[in-house]
Amino acid sequence: MFAEVLTIGDELLTGHTVDSNSAFIASKLTEQGYWVRRITTVGDDVEEIKAVVGEILARKPEVLVISGGLGPTHDDVTMLAVAEALGRKLVLCEKCLERIKAFYEKLYSEGYIDDPSLNEGRKKMAYLPEGAEPLENTGGAAPGAFIEHKGVKIFVLPGMPREMKAMLEKEVLPRLGRRKFLQRKFLAEITDESKLAPILREALERFNVRIHSSPKGFGKYIGLIIFAEDEGELEKTVEYLESRGIRLEEA
């Protein structure tokens, strides 16, 4: 039920681009019933990406979603890094090459580019890790990739938000399916988060749930979201919190 997200790009580390991709991916995985355990960001460096992918795989999540670094430029090295991290070769996907060719010919016919030929940068995008299943990019040139490796489902997606979102919705989520996952939102009538913290910790020790708390400034309420796979566990958690004097209102 655990998942991790890895976003890639020097622009994310310098602050020139806000990483909205990881938030979108995490929200969609949560809706599908996965708990996102970590979100990691790394720059466009093969060795750095390899190291981080290795660390993630050692934690054995069920799902790893990677976003960014699939384009035609010199610093788009994600597919190479992922392949090396998995001990695989990069191999040409002929189907991907044909689609990339058609994509640039369409741009040329519409007057967006002046040369539709497949230069080395464009060809590079057709290479995927050996054994990977290509994921269709309906909004751009670079295909994504789906790889199952030692029990981990790995998805490699583009970094352009529009392309990433479409690929996640159309190619990734259907392969994951929806798991039984419940969440309920409450407002806890308590003003001091430090007094609520030990009660939440006790609830987490007693029940198979996850609890997210978000203070609303120094107002009257603290927001709570309780996540569970079993409705009984969720209900017992609510009853326990109320037995400890925490008044809960559905949010």
Curated annotation (Swiss-Prot):
Classification via SUPFAM superfamilies: Molybdenum cofactor biosynthesis proteins (SSF53218)
Pfam (any one): MoCF_biosynth
NCBIfam families per the UniProt record, alphabetical: molyb_syn, PRK03670.1
Family indicated by similarity: Belongs to the CinA family.
Name listed for the protein in its UniProt record: Protein TK1472
Organism field: Thermococcus kodakarensis (strain ATCC BAA-918 / JCM 12380 / KOD1)
Lineage, uppermost ranks: Archaea, Methanobacteriati, Methanobacteriota, Thermococci, Thermococcales
